[in-house]
Amino acid sequence: MESMGNNSPGPEIRALARNIRMSAHKARRVINQIRGRSYGQALMILELMPYGACYPISQLIHSAAANANHNMGLNKANLLVGRVEVNEGAVFKRIQPRAQGRGYPIQKPTCHITIVSEEISRSNDPIMSIESRKKGYVWRRK
């Protein structure tokens, strides 16, 4: 009987950030730009984007790379940002005082971000592979 789970050959390289104080759609705007990129490219993109969501996402990518290095002995240059999910978290509800004793409701959304990285040699992308050279990255077709 076949398993219904993940079909990847090795264990997952995961990093999870929970209850990040930003809305999920603002985090997805940034996440969609780095999905499928290499570790170095993802960090360069995040450094140049002018959004506040870039900082916690870059911290999470650093954490995933540190997990891969510490737990599996993989090199950071060989990592690829694979599956990335942004889910909505709890909503903090607050009240802003208004005139004449009224209260104005404020909702402060949170989100959960999950990054699953994979090694470039194990990636399932048949079109492109990336090789590390002395002068950065060289794209080649398989």
UniProtKB/Swiss-Prot annotation:
Subcellular location field: Plastid, Chloroplast
GO molecular function, one term: rRNA binding
GO terms under cellular component: chloroplast; large ribosomal subunit
InterPro entries: Ribosomal_uL22, Ribosomal_uL22_bac/chlpt-type, Ribosomal_uL22_bac/org-type, Ribosomal_uL22_sf
Record keywords: Chloroplast, Plastid, Ribonucleoprotein, Ribosomal protein, RNA-binding, rRNA-binding
Entry-linked Pfam families: Ribosomal_L22
Chief place of localization: plastid
Name listed for the protein in its UniProt record: Large ribosomal subunit protein uL22c
